[in-house]
Amino acid sequence: HDDIGLGFEDSSIAAAGFNAYEHRKFLKDYYSGVHPGSPASGALFSVNPKTQDARISGSLASLCGLEKALESRNQSLIDIAVKKILLMQAQSFFVGGIPMLFYGDEAAYTNDYSYLNDPGKSYDNRWMHRPLIDWKKNQKTKEAGTIEHLIFSGTQKLLKLRKQLSVTADHKNIRWITPHNIHVSGFIRSLGDDHLYCLFNYSNKAAYLTWYAFKEQGYQIENLYDHWNEKRYSVGADYEYLIIEPYSFCLLAAQKKS
């Protein structure tokens, strides 16, 4: 991304039971770090003083909390930020279109504030997410255990899966899943007899999704293979459930009953 706009339809937010003005205010406050407890380190760009509309600047890593986590040297918060970054990238890559990386995202670059020392850039905070490349940092993408390696290898795996799974090619084949759990964003990509359930848990708590959610489309499913976590699940009774860990996601390929 460059600066992020909040150009959604007010009616869409109202249909979800929220006030569009207050929803925008929350997003602006959260990602600019003003909201109490927000882990994000962003900034507002192009603020309209009359309407209070604004856009959001900041690198993906900083908006997901990595900058503050590193400053506090809190390993738990660092781990959460890494999970959030891959969660955001996963939904972006698998929802359709051409997967796009904003440079620096592949190595978890946080905001670069050096632009403030340049009179030709200091007036425009979008430069914070247009970092100068640090080649020593880039080398860390090859060092197992580093944040850079976790993000780089995770991003590579996501792109490999997107390329490998033909059902994710752009066939306008997305169907959004009934929101049985409000914290889970989910859709199905279908092509012929192939069905891929893409599920993303945006909560800081584990999400429970009943197996009925995988049956209500009428597919006769026996088990599901998660390409991301490389695990197989047997589909249980309607009242039993799949557990998705906090800030985690699943890419579940359906396998029919024989």
Could you tell me what each predicted segment is?
Residues 2-258:
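Active-site and adjacent substrate-binding regions of carbohydrate-active enzymes
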